Curated annotation (Swiss-Prot):
Retina. It comes from Bos taurus. This is Sodium/potassium/calcium exchanger 1. It catalyses: Ca(2+)(out) + K(+)(out) + 4 Na(+)(in) = Ca(2+)(in) + K(+)(in) + 4 Na(+)(out). Sequence repeats lie at residues 796-811, 812-828, 829-845, 846-862, 863-879, 880-896, 897-913, 914-928.
């Protein structure tokens, strides 16, 4: 409990008590005030006597809780004289008898010997009442010998606040709202245990009510308490709070109802009614007493749930009760009853109605007026408490300084009600522990809240940068070190990298803000991912999304199972430790399944394949390895090994964070002008984007063949694969390559990697995107502008490709493609390439990164670093090209030294060029060195017709001789195609292989780009410089404090990067939740709603941007599967992990998670998930724009319904 809350009037009203540490000065000041008040009160006639009597029996301890407890300071007035026995200070009252279960509060019952005229006030304090201090510390058990030890020991731990609140004007008391705790009556229902907290009301007499927190008749989540201790009813005291005006001593206590005794106790709050009025905390001390299940806050705080600030206000009511405590000489059953009744009336929470109040001291003749504001004030009256005796001497104790106690936590996080909370429990739930804001609520409402909104949005960007630039790369290094498979890594480490903000938000919600902000954020983020992200991907993709059914089906199956568990656990609004463990085990099961994902996938598909329907599903995606057909041959398996997890989305857990395709937010903001636009490579993207094209069915490819001359060895244009794979491919493909002349039919990309680097440093360009067939994506940004359209063959090859029939090609290509047709012989020096030779072909080569494809009897000699040489029938290719593709047709001869170009030559053509693309028709000769094509581009296209000769030194070569070039080339392609294809089946297989290899190549290039370490280099353009300065406050501290493991020299510090990233994420998450809380407080919406809406969207927007970019590249299913996969981590780790930690720290106590609308929101999420999977399945695993738009709208419908549920505008039909 070591936290005190300052109850200053202003702060009380704001309902947001501030934490303060009690200081000696305040304590001394309070003591002085109490002492002076006591002196003043002792002057009246019988008080000294009464006091003397009381003190003789039980020396009064000032503030049994003693300020130390913060609970209350008891004023011990020394006047022994005041005879008024009234001073019963029986704290015990209210819950006396029935208290047993509740946390003991200190009931200090000073039983006064009844003073002279006063009927003996027998405080109902039980003799054996032994308060157990829970919250505050010292409980004074003071079992008073007083007669009628009615309160047989109160177990309550409430500290006895002996504070005698002076009953100043009863009006004041009135002002204090009794409702506070137990009653909250008025407003705050929870007043568990110690509603007396509120009872600050001055107790006219010395009554020191000891508010037992026990009875929270008010709801308060202490349901347990309530149930058990109905007796607590006596607690009413708080409620009682009546105003007992008894500032006047003697008779003034006019309204001290008999029940007053109990009231008294409940009021025990020493804080004077003033305090109450002020809404001062006073209650806090009570709180301690309340500590029993009731969270101390409760009392002091006025119920756990109730905002702490409220407590104060409510406390007032409580105090009144205590005031009433006039010592009643005896607690006759009748009186007791009356008191109790009255009390009840005031505090309607009858359930606690334990009669305990036996202290019905009729104390003052005047009934307590006790208008308890507490709700249900039903008159309860002015029960005159049969004042057996009027205690003339009301000992009015000056209100002790309010000792703030820790605010009670919101009930949501409270521990289970039936279980008595440990004495320290109240501290577990202090109300939102946020630093004090520089601006007050009024100032924020005047416009300063804009700063909080900006800060919250800025932190969203900071979280994305930390995760993408440091945390995810560090996790990647860890998975490499542990040699974890891609599937398992994607489901564990990479999922954690993407969901780290949500996890930390959940931790902050449980341990710091004590609210449901974490649950709201995770549920809101889940709906955002399922509806908004997937819907947006469908809307913005260039074509209808063809989804891979297996990963989506697998992840949604697990997700539905996990959500059903969560809904069941939410039914009782409590999460027990074993429920948290079950959710964590569900995640472990998911990871285990991912370990055997491929085997499971094959088994499921085999089972489905036995039925016609299954085939439709299985054939749903041809683009993914292993997904295209039920039977996955070795070839596919080998490819899977080659491909990185990102592109094998179908067979691995979908995690954008695990994919090199993902561009970080920092890179997007600084280096991409059009993040949502297609990467440069897809310039001509009318054709299918690289992946979609891959997805195209073999039939489509077959159709395209006839059109495009290439008998298409459709994929003969396999992009260079890593060297190790070269030989294997050679062996596999020899028969299928017969089509040497073919050049890229079907718009496949070739020349991949090789051209990409040469063509530009365009990060977006997926490596080697030059599509040989219809689409050349290989052009660099620079090149694209100076591109001269090729007019041949319908311009299937925009970017130069060299095709020569019967020609001879000599070149040294670093990054080119050499394809040789039948009769060709290939001899090359390639380090990283693939050599594919057709029938009768001879291949000898050392490829760097290129592919040599030779047709039957073809001969190719070349020294390629990264290229492909394609030669037509009888062609000989010898090239020295740096970055180009040489395609030679029959009888063609090409000699060139190209740095960044492609040479295309027709029959009998000779081409020599240094930089550019040369396309020559029959008999055409073009020689150029350092030639620039239109626009002065380094990478241009030169097209020459028959008989044309063009030579250029360093000037533009723009020669277009279009005689028969087009026809000839088409003819050549046709021949090549005829020779090349042995069968459609072989071609289809080749296409699939080549597609995969192309994807891999592109991925590698992008990976290289994305793996670039964070650079603080000053950008060139003004716009980028502005963005750079905007991000510098985030990036610079990260750069200084966290090693970038993407740098080779820093890779060994991956542990520091991992831990440092976690610290930064935790800090940014805290700022995000804090500022969101301030914004919500200003606008008037709860943290739960902020989590469902703003925080959920903010933490998921980086993934949204990445998903849309990936979807536009054709990897739509990857984006969709990733959205569902990340949600599994949130539900099975993000939620249960903080709950489990909380339970372990607090003795395996359950965590309260009740909320007006969260349960219904989870049910809505479940229904939306069923809708999404069923609608996609009905659409045959394709997502059109109409379905995407529908999901987009459903997201907003969900938000509106959730907010209305949380604000109780509508009620949840399935609430529990």
């Amino acid at each position: 409990m070591g936290k005190l809350i300052r109850m200053g009037a202003q702060e009380r009203r704001s309902l947001w008590p501030k934490r303060l540490h009690w200081s000696r000065p305040l304590f001394l000041l309070g003591m002085l005030i109490i002492g002076s008040t006591y002196q003043y009160l002792t002057s009246p006639q019988g008080l000294p006597t009464l006091w003397a009597a009381v003190s003789s029996q039980h020396p009064v301890k000032v503030a049994s809780r003693d300020l130390s407890n913060k609970e209350m300071m008891m004023v011990s007035s020394e006047t022994s004289k005041s005879s008024s026995e009234m001073e019963v200070e029986a704290w015990a009252p209210e819950a006396t008898a029935g208290r047993d279960g509740t946390p003991p509060g200190i009931a200090r019952k000073n039983t006064p010997s009844t003073p002279r005229g006063t009927a003996s006030i027998t405080p109902a304090i039980p003799n054996n009442y032994s308060p157990t201090p829970t919250g505050t510390g010292k409980v004074k058990e003071d079992t008073s010998a007083t007669p009628s030890g009615v309160l047989n020991h109160y177990t309550q731990s409430r500290p006895m606040v002996n504070s005698y609140t002076r009953l100043t004007a009863r009006g004041e008391v009135k002002s204090s709202r009794p409702t506070q705790s137990r009653g909250k009556e008025e407003k705050y229902s929870p007043s568990p245990l110690g509603r007396m907290v509120n009872s600050y009301a001055p107790s006219t007499l010395m009554t020191m009510p000891r508010s037992h927190g026990i009875t929270p008749r008010t709801t308060v989540k202490d349901r347990e308490i309530m149930a058990t201790k109905k007796m607590l009813a006596t607690n009413p005291s708080k409620r009682l709070v009546e105003k007992t005006t008894p500032t006047p001593l003697k008779g003034i206590t006019d309204n001290t109802p008999t029940f007053l005794l109990s009231d008294l106790e409940t009021d025990t709050l020493t804080s004077p009614r003033n305090v109450v009025e002020k809404k001062t905390l006073t209650t806090p001390r009570r709180v301690d007493s309340n500590s029993s299940t009731n969270h101390q806050g409760l009392v002091g705080k006025n119920n756990l749930t109730t905002p702490q600030g409220m407590v104060l206000e409510h406390t007032a009511a409580v105090s009144e009760g205590q005031v009433t405590i006039s010592t009643m000489t005896r607690s006759s059953p009748t009186e007791t009853k009356a008191s109790t009744d009255a009390w009840k009336v005031r505090n309607p929470l009858p359930r606690t109605s334990a009669p305990i109040i036996r202290i019905s001291s009729a104390t003052f003749r005047g009934l307590l007026k006790n208008p308890s504001k507490a709700p249900s004030t039903p008159a309860a009256p002015r029960v005159r408490a049969n004042p057996t005796i009027q205690v003339r001497h009301c000992l009015v104790v000056e209100p002790a300084p309010v000792a703030p106690t820790a605010p009670s936590p919101s009930w949501t996080t409270a521990v289970i009600p039936g279980i008595p909370s440990p004495s320290g429990q109240p501290d577990l739930y202090p109300k939102a522990e946020y630093p004090r804001d520089l601006f007050s609520v009024e100032e924020r409402r005047q416009g300063w809240v804009v700063l909080h909104i900006f800060g919250m949005m800025y932190v969203f960007v900071a979280l994305a940068i930390v995760c993408d630039e440091y945390f995810v790369p560090a996790l990647g290094v860890i998975t490499d070190k542990l040699q974890i498979s891609e599937d398992v890594a994607g489901a564990t480490f990479m999922a954690a990298g993407g969901s780290a903000p949500e996890l930390f938000t959940s931790l902050i919600g449980v341990f710091i803000s004590h609210s449901n902000v974490g649950i709201g954020t995770i549920v809101g983020s889940a709906v955002f991912n399922i509806l908004f992200v997937i819907g947006t991907c469908a809307l913005f993709s260039r074509e209808i999304l063809n989804l891979t059914w297996w990963p989506l089906f697998r992840d949604i199956t697990f997700y539905i199972f996990d959500l059903m568990m969560l809904i069941l656990f939410f039914l009782d609004s409590l999460i027990a430790w074993w429920e948290s463990v079950l959710l964590l085990l569900a995640y472990a099961f998911y990871v285990f399944t991912m370990k055997w994902n491929q085997q499971l996938e094959l088994w499921v598909k085999e089972q489905l394949n036995k039925r016609p329907v299954a085939k439709v599903m299985a054939l749903g995606d041809l683009s993914k390895p292993g997904d295209g057909t039920v039977v996955v041959d070795e070839q596919q398996d080998n490819k899977k090994l080659k491909l990185s997890s990102m592109l094998t989305r179908g067979s691995s857990s979908a995690s954008l964070h695990n994919s090199t395709i993902r561009s970080t937010i920092y890179q997007l903001m600084l280096h991409s002008l059009d993040p949502l636009g297609e990467a440069r490579p897809s310039k001509d993207k009318e054709e299918e984007t690289l992946i979609p094209e891959a997805k195209a069915t073999p039939q489509a490819k077959a159709e395209s063949k006839p059109e495009e001359e290439p008998a298409k060895l459709p994929e003969v244009t396999v992009t260079p694969a890593p060297a190790p794979d070269v030989k294997g491919d050679q062996e596999e493909d020899p028969g299928s390559q017969g089509v040497g002349a073919e050049a890229e039919n079907t718009g496949e990309r070739t020349g991949g990697e090789a051209e990409a680097p040469a063509e530009g440093e365009n990060g977006e360009r997926s490596g080697g995107d030059a599509a040989l067939g219809g689409e050349s994506e290989g052009k660099a940004e620079n090149e694209s502008e100076g591109d001269i359209p090729a007019e041949r063959r319908g311009d299937d090859e925009d970017e130069g490709e060299i095709q020569a029939e019967g020609g001879e090609v000599k070149g040294d290509e670093d990054e080119g493609e050499i394809q040789a047709g039948e009769g060709g012989e290939v001899e090359g020096d390639e380090d990283e390439g693939e050599i594919q030779a057709g029938e009768g072909g001879e291949v000898e080569g050392d490829e760097d990164e290129g592919e040599i494809q030779a047709g039957e009897a073809g001969e190719v000699e070349g020294d390629e670093d990264e290229g492909e040489i394609q030669a037509g029938e009888g062609g000989e290719v010898e090239g020295d090209e740096d970055e180009g593709e040489i395609q030679a047709g029959e009888a063609g001869e090409v000699e060139g030294d190209e740095d960044e170009g492609e040479i295309q030559a027709g029959e009998g053509g000779e081409v020599k060029g240094d930089e550019g693309e040369i396309q020559a028709g029959e008999a055409g000769e073009v020689e150029g060195e350092d030639g620039e094509v239109e626009g002065g581009e380094d990478e241009g296209e030169i097209q020459a017709g028959e008989g044309g000769e063009g030579e250029t030194g360093e000037q533009e070569l723009n020669a277009e001789i279009q005689g028969e070039a087009k026809d000839d080339e088409e003819g050549v392609d046709g021949e090549g195609g005829g020779d090349g294809g042995d069968s459609e089946d072989e071609e289809e297989e080749d296409e699939e292989e080549e597609d995969e290899e192309e994807e891999e190549e592109e991925e590698e290039e992008e990976e290289e780009e994305n793996e670039q370490p964070l650079s603080l280099e000053w950008p060139e353009t003004r716009r980028k410089q502005a963005i750079y300065l905007f991000l510098l406050p985030i990036v610079f501290p990260l750069w200084l404090t966290v090693p970038d493991v993407r740098r080779l020299e820093a890779k060994k510090f991956f542990v520091i990067t991992f831990l440092g990233s976690i610290l930064w994420i935790a800090m940014f998450s805290y700022l995000m939740v804090w500022w969101a809380h301030q914004v919500g407080e200003t606008i008037g919406i709860s943290e739960e709603i902020m989590g469902l809406t703003i925080l959920a969207a903010g933490t998921s927007i980086p993934d949204l941007i990445t998903s849309v970019i990936v979807a536009r590249k054709g990897l739509g299913d990857m984006a969709v599967s990733s959205s569902v996969g990340s949600n599994i981590f949130d539900i099975t780790v993000g939620l249960p992990l903080p709950w489990m930690l909380f339970s372990l720290i607090n003795g395996l106590q359950p965590v309260a998670v009740s909320s007006n609308g969260l349960f219904c929101a989870i049910v809505l999420l479940f229904l939306m998930l069923l809708f999404v999977i069923s609608s996609i399945a009905l659409c045959k695993w394709r997502m059109n724009k109409i379905l995407g738009f529908t999901m987009f709208l459903l997201y907003f419908v969900f938000l509106i319904i959730s907010v209305m549920l949380e604000d109780r505008i509508i009620s949840c039909p399935v609430s529990v």
